[in-house]
Structures are given as C-alpha cells and as structure tokens.
C-alpha cells in the first residue's frame, strides 16, 4: 500500500450505509423559493460536483459514490440555525457550530454516517485540542474527518464559499481559507492535495 493510505479508516465503505434522497431532507428544513435555500443548494451542488470529479479521477480509492453525492449535498444542512445574515441565516448559533448542528439533524433523521460528514467538515476538521485551545463554541470532542469519503467532501468544500457562489477557489486560495485553523489543518489540506488532485 502507498504510504499516504496509512492509518486511513475505510469504515464508510465497510459499513452498511442507509441511502436517501437528500432533497427530502433539504425540503424539510429549507422552504422553497427562499434565498437561504438557493444559497445552500447552489453551494452544495458545487461541492458535490467537485467531490464527484475527484472521485472519478481516483477509482483506485474505491469510494462510495452514492454516499459521497448524498453527504456532499447535506454537509451544510445546519446553517439555518446560525447567525450568518450575509448568507440569509438568522438563527442564534455562531456559524462555526453549523457542522455539529447539521449532524444533530441528520442523526435525528436516521443517517448517522451522513451526520459525521456534517460534524467533521469545518475547516480541515477540528481536533479536540484545537477546539479547547481556541475556545470554539462547539462540543468538546474530535471533529476530524476520518473516512476517505469524509476527507474528500471536507476537501471539496474548501474550494467554494457561500458568499461567492459562482466562483471556484484556486488551490492556493482554498489553502489560505483554512490557514486560520492552524498548521495541523494546513498539513491535512496538503495531504488531501496529494491524495485527491
């Protein structure tokens, strides 16, 4: 095996994953014909498209195609609960909480593996150590992407912002956007460049 695969958990391929229509869940939490829904869907489709292109370019990774598509479309399902008016979200939680809030929604809907993608996609993932050191307003637990599918979606998400929906970031701009999360995040991002690009 190549060294880059060392210590990677392939559990999402090994477990029985319950599949679904992501739009049934989106419909439940995001009313039709709202800017909030439009922002969510356009961004999520861009992330899903990028993830699927990388998945197709790397058949040797044997990623779970339907899971990647579904989870990429739902990775930001929790944004409506946050206070982020620039993207039409008028909830009460800080934006950084959208990952674990989305995970709570998907667990309640019966999709625990999809929930982990929500919880683990913020930045390049959040370690418990970083959460505590930076006093981030999220639960104190590891929130690092583990499976290759989780890593792929987290990586694809770094190329798109919800404030510039029609623009894909360059690798350098995507890298800069996660620099605020620390050296560990940059190191993960660089590993993903080698693995997925």
Question: Each predicted region: which residue ranges?
Answer:
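Cationic, low-complexity basic patches in intrinsically disordered or flexible, solvent-exposed regions
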Residues: 15
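Amphipathic alpha-helical segments within well-ordered protein domains
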Residues: 27, 48, 52-55, 102-107, ...
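Short, small-residue-biased leader/transition segments that mark boundaries at the very start
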Residues: 1-2
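Active-site flanking loop/helix segments enriched in acidic
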Residues: 21-43, 81-91
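Divalent metal-dependent catalytic cores for phosphoryl transfer on phosphate-bearing substrates
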Residues: 31, 60-167, 171
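Active-site hotspot residues in diverse enzymes, especially metal/ion-binding acidic/histidine motifs
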Residues: 19-26, 53, 57, 171
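Charged phosphate-binding loop/patch that engages nucleotide di/tri-phosphates or the phosphate backbone
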Residues: 180-197
């Amino acid at each position: 095996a190549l060294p880059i695969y060392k210590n990677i958990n392939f559990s999402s391929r090994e477990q029985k994953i319950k599949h679904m229509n992501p739009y049934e869940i989106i419909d439940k939490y995001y009313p039709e014909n709202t800017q909030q829904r439009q922002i969510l869907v356009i961004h999520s489709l861009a992330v899903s498209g990028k993830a699927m292109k990388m998945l197709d370019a790397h058949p040797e990774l044997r990623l779970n195609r339907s899971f990647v598509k579904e989870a990429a479309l739902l990775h930001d399902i929790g944004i409506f609960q946050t206070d982020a008016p620039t993207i039409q979200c008028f909830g009460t939680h800080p934006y950084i909480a959208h990952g674990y809030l989305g995970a709570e929604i998907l667990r309640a809907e019966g999709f625990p593996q999809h929930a982990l993608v929500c919880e683990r996609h913020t930045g390049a993932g959040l370690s418990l150590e970083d959460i505590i050191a930076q006093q981030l307003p999220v639960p104190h637990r590891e929130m690092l992407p583990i499976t290759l599918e989780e890593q792929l979606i987290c990586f694809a998400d770094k190329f798109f912002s919800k404030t510039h929906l029609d623009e894909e970031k360059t690798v350098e701009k995507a890298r800069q956007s996660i620099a605020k999360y620390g050296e560990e995040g940059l190191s993960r991002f660089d590993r993903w460049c080698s693995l997925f690009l």
